[in-house]
């Protein structure tokens, strides 16, 4: 969220390749996909190709904590009903406050229960074909001063991959948090820090990343893990983009292609840069291939976005898809949501409030009242117009992102939210079932 791992059974290609039997040779023609044509094809071992784009969901708030997804984990720290003083703002401070052993106990319980095998079966039954699984660097390595619980998450990731395989789902592994934080978001593990390009932090991040690439790019996993996102949402307007490219992205690509000779797909988040920014980086013309650009799209994280009329939101969503079509790389909308407000508790962070009702404040910035957030999580009190608009917004985004490689909605489930919970939205008949069902067709034409 604004918030980013061959070839044996069923692999994803992004080109019109004929006779695309799974092969083990390591060259550009055996890549899971390239991007010369705007088609996506699943190629089965029986050689029957089925046109199918990515229709995925994010498993947010599981192996990387996010307070708004599982507020119960953070509410246990509350000392008074009037403010959020003393409540950890992220996983770093959650672990720091509890101490290692108690944090491990609570996190292990959360990891064991928040997603189970039946969730993967349900996700597949609802027509999705991929899950994107965020994980932090601290799952694989830590710095000497880190309070994080480490070396436990990998078991749950591996089990998730097994479940995905069992139910015919593909997996993207997403390095969601870098040492020192790449964006200052709470979902990076450490809020209000932007230090991942410092030498020690970069070294730890690269250590975790090369481990992920080494393990999940082997033939044992390549039938199911069809992409590895090198880093989720690096904050391009703040960090040094050249250092990001030269010290993390390019070395990771070279390590994958030249050191371990794998054709695993690499996913690069757009770093909040404009369309076409990445056209000249790791592209087919330079004989560098198998790279997806991941765009994340939300319309609730500024006062301007929150005041848009519905027709304007739809128009902007449709334009996202149209703008991505002409990029050099294939792209996927790796995050987006149904949200029309920022009212979900702690969406903007513990202690920060919501812009929609004017309660948001950070440093010297304030928001102004647009409308009430009361009853935001009580669907019985949603006006019919809001339900219709939410469905309309979802459908427009799905149609827009079908113009390129597909989409991965954020996120599959939460404890309390409606706008950010695909599972609840399906139950409420707000998210379409089947996925191609449209109450509001042709919005992007």
Swiss-Prot record:
Record GO biological process:
ascospore formation; cell wall organization; glucan catabolic process
Q: What is its main location?
A: secreted
The domain of life for this entry's organism is Eukaryota
Catalytic activity reported: Successive hydrolysis of beta-D-glucose units from the non-reducing ends of (1->3)-beta-D-glucans, releasing alpha-glucose
Molecular functions per Gene Ontology: glucan exo-1,3-beta-glucosidase activity
Q: Which InterPro entries does this chain map to?
A: Glyco_hydro_5 (IPR001547), Glyco_hydro_5_CS (IPR018087), Glycoside_hydrolase_SF (IPR017853), Glycosyl_hydrolase_5 (IPR050386)
Q: Which UniProt keywords apply?
A: Cell wall biogenesis/degradation, Glycoprotein, Glycosidase, Hydrolase, Secreted, Signal, Sporulation
User: A single Pfam family, by name?
Assistant: Cellulase
Which cell locations does it reside in? Secreted
**Known glycosylation sites:** 201
Q: Which PROSITE patterns match?
A: GLYCOSYL_HYDROL_F5 (PS00659)
The family annotation for this protein states: Belongs to the glycosyl hydrolase 5 (cellulase A) family.
Please describe what this protein does. Probably involved in the processes of spore formation and contributes to ascospore thermoresistance by participating in the morphogenesis of ascospore walls. The enzyme may do this by modifying glucan linkages in the developing ascospore wall, thus strengthening it or lending it plasticity.
* PANTHER family named in the record: GLUCAN 1,3-BETA-GLUCOSIDASE I_II-RELATED, GLUCAN ENDO-1,6-BETA-GLUCOSIDASE B
Q: What is this protein called?
A: Sporulation-specific glucan 1,3-beta-glucosidase
Encoded by which gene? SPR1
